[in-house]
């Protein structure tokens, strides 16, 4: 990995990226309301389960395949798989989340003129656009490798989930850092699993997450949009 590639992926994984990630908990707040999360240990277990049982089977391998599609500029597969992923979201909130963040990242890529004109035109044609599709575009525009791209995406997801737990449980800063440290190995394992997953084995089935997310839509008191 070059220094430039590292800096690009640190940029994409940064919580300062203006795509609104901080406003979503992806079901964590609903899990707290359902008493599935009570403290730092249960928060760590919930985030670990989301990483290994959901992200590693669905979002991460999907990201890897979309990265390959951008690299070869396979416009038909890009559009078809992007539409499939958006349709696979388990609730209205989760669908709006990936669409809003995907749109924001796509707008950022266009404004910064990342990628060549032909690929930018393809990016603009995808509406709605899922976050992993836009993230894959940004990585491909800088020639980032698949393993590092997936690691950056997974770390950003873990960091955002941890930040949501800090606010919602609530937890202290040290507890949050312990969660991130504890999940380093799980991130590596999730990336390796995702890279070994063929396109026809990508699986976004997550019934518990879907039910909790649907409940969150009518939850009485909420900090987050999902």
From Swiss-Prot:
GO terms for cellular component: cytoplasm. InterPro entries: UreF, UreF_sf. The keyword Cytoplasm applies. Keywords: Chaperone, Cytoplasm, Nickel insertion. It holds the Pfam family UreF. It is found in: Cytoplasm. GO terms for molecular function: nickel cation binding. Required for maturation of urease via the functional incorporation of the urease nickel metallocenter. UreD, UreF and UreG form a complex that acts as a GTP-hydrolysis-dependent molecular chaperone, activating the urease apoprotein by helping to assemble the nickel containing metallocenter of UreC. The UreE protein probably delivers the nickel. Belongs to the UreF family. This is Urease accessory protein UreF. It comes from Burkholderia orbicola (strain MC0-3).
């Amino acid at each position: 990995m070059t220094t430039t590639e590292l800096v690009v992926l640190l940029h994409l994984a940064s919580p300062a990226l203006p795509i609104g990630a901080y406003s979503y908990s992806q079901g964590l707040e609903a899990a707290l309301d359902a008493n599935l999360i009570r403290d730092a240990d249960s928060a760590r277990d919930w985030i670990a389960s989301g990483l290994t049982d959901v992200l590693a089977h669905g979002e991460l391998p999907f990201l890897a395949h979309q990265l390959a599609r951008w690299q070869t500029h396979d416009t038909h597969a890009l559009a078809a798989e992007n539409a499939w992923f958006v349709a696979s979201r388990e609730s209205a909130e989760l669908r709006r989340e990936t669409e809003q963040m995907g749109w924001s990242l796509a707008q950022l890529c266009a404004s910064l003129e990342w990628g060549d004109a032909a690929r930018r035109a393809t990016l603009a044609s995808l509406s709605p656009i899922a976050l992993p599709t836009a993230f894959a575009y940004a990585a491909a525009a800088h020639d980032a490798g698949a393993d590092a791209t997936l690691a950056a995406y997974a770390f950003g997801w873990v960091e955002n989930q941890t930040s949501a737990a800090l606010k919602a449980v609530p937890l202290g800063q040290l507890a949050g850092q312990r969660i991130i440290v504890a999940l380093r190995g799980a991130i590596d394992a999730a990336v390796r699993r995702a890279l070994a997953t063929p396109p026809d084995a990508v699986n976004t089935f997550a019934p518990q997450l879907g039910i909790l997310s649907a409940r969150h839509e009518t939850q009485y008191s909420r900090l987050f949009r999902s």
